[in-house]
Amino acid sequence: MKYFSYFFSVAALFICIGLTGCVNLNIASSEQQENYTLKRLFPTDINPSVSFDESIIASPLLDYSQGKPLILVSVSNGIIAALNGDTGKVDWQINAPTPEGQTTQLISTPVIIDHKLVILYQCLDKGVRTSHRLAVIDLAKKQLDPTFPVLILSAEKLTTDGINSVKFNPPTAFSHSALKHAPKPDSKLGYVYAAFGNSGDEQPYHGWLFEIDMEAWRANNSESQQKPKKNTISNVLLTTPESQCPVTKAYGNQEMICGGGIWTPPGPQIYPSDDTFEIFVPTGNGQINLKRHDYANTIMRLKPGLQFDASCDTQLCANFDPLNPDRACIASCKNLFIPRLLENDTPLQPATGECDNKAYAECLAWMDYDLGGSAPVKIQMENGLSVLVQPSKDGGVFLIDAKHLGTQYDRLQIVDVCGTKTDQCKLSWMGMIVTQPVHTTINEEPIVVIPTFVPDKTHPAGMVALKIVLENGQPKFKRFWQFPQTSNLDALKLFRSHPSLPTINKQSASANEIVWIVDINQNGTIYGVRIKDGALVAKQTLKGAGRPLSTPLIFSNNIYVASIMPGTNKAMIEAYRIEITKN
C-alpha cells in the first residue's frame, strides 16, 4: 500500500511515463457514430481560473446550494473553494480549522448532506500527524457550521482475547478513502463513515472505520439539551485487533502483520439491503487470522453498527492457514471474501522471481498487491442473483456472490503482471489496477469497465470491458472490448501509471453511454470511449498532467477534472464543454 509516493509528487510518475513519447489516436469512425469535441472553458486567457499551491487529491463535487452550479474543490492543504462552473473564478473559499502552528492535509473526498459539506482532514505538527478531524461547512451560508463543533477522532478497541487494547494512533493512520453517507431511520442527516489505513506500510497500523451519527453530533452542541449527550462516534470497526505488530522488515505488509488498512480512494461501498443498508469494506495487505478476527486483504460486509461476524463454518475453518486457506473454509464464509486463484489459474509469476515458491496470499503480500486498493461494485443480474465485481492490484478481477461472499464465481486476469527480465517494472508496488469499476447494461447484459495500467514498456494496458454472462446458471466474465486494442501500439504507450477513476454519462436521452477517463502524463489526456463497442469518440489534451485516482465530475455537458502543472506543481481544475457532432 505504498500510497504516499504519488500523492504529493509527480516526479515518480513522469519517470514511469516520460519515456513513452507523444501518442496520436484517431477518433474511431462508424456509421451514424457520435463524435465529441471538448472545448476548454477554463483555464483560458479569458478565464484563467485559479491555481493552488498544493495538490487537489480529493475528487471535485457539485454544489447547487446558491441556486447556481458551483464546483467544490478540496485542496490537500485544507482549502475548500467553490468555483464558478463556467469561469473557474472563486465564488468563496474557507480553510479547514487547524490548531495554530500546525499544517493540514485533506486527502479524502468530502460528502454533501443536505447542503452541508462534511470534511475529513489531518493536522500535522512538524510533519507528524497529531490528530484526525471532521468538520462541517454550511454551503448555503458559506461558513463553518457552528452547530457541528470540530470532531477529533479517537478510539480504543480490545484485542480478541480481551487482555490488551489497540488505540487509534494518529501518526500511523491516514485517511485516503472518500467519506460515505448512509441513511438512518428518523434522522435527516444519517450516518457518515470515515475510513483509515496508513500513508505507507510503516507499522504499527491497522484498518479503522468510524461510524458518525450526524444528529448526535449536532445534538451534542445544543445548549438547551436536557437529556444526556449522545455518542457522536456511534461505533468503530478495527480490522486487525492486534496490540503488537512485531515486524523485521521495512514494510509490515510483506510479513502479513497487522495492517488491513481501508484505503481505496472511492471508500467503502454502501448499498440498500432489505429495510436497512450494507457496507462492503475492502481491506489492504496485512494479517489474516479468522480465530483472532484479523481480516486484512479481504472484503468485509457489515451492517449499521459495524459489528462484524464473518459467519464462516467453525469446523471447516478450525485449522485456518493464512498462506494456504482451505477452500471449503473460505467458501463457507457468508460475510467475508478471501481472494484465491481458480483451481486452473496460473500462479502469479513476476519476472523478478519474487513469488517463486510462494503461495498466492504470500505473493500478494510480498508484492504489495492489496485486494483493498480498489472498491467493489454491486450488480443485479436478470436471474435475480446479485454479484460483486472486485478488482485487485495483481491485475485480476473477482466475481463474487453478493449475498454469500465466500462464493467466488470467477476470476479473470485482465492485465499482465508488470515487468519482464529485460524490461524491469518501474514501480512494482503500484500493481496494475487501483480503481472502482463502472457498470451499465446493454441488451440486458451487465457490462463492467475496469481501467488498468502497467509501469513498463512491454505489456498492454487501458480500459477493459467485461460482460457478465450466465453459463449453466452461474455468472462468468466474458471479455467484451479493450481500449486501446491490444494489437495497437498505443496499448504499450498509454496507461503507464495510475489513471483517474472512470465515470459514465450520456449527453442526451438518445445518445450512447460513454466512459470517460484521464490518462496521466506531462500533459494528461481525457478519453471518451463508447461502451457499446469500445470505440474512441473523444480525446482532449489537458493543460496539466491530470490527477491520479480522482473522479472527473460531469454536469450539464461539462467535464471537470483535477490537474497539476508539472513545471510549477500548481494545482487547478480544468473544465471542458462536451459538444456532440454527428457524422
Identify the residue ranges that each predicted region occupies.
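Bacterial N-terminal signal peptides
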Residues: 9-20
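Extracytoplasmic/lumenal domain signature
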Residues: 23-56, 62-73, 78-104, 111-117, ...
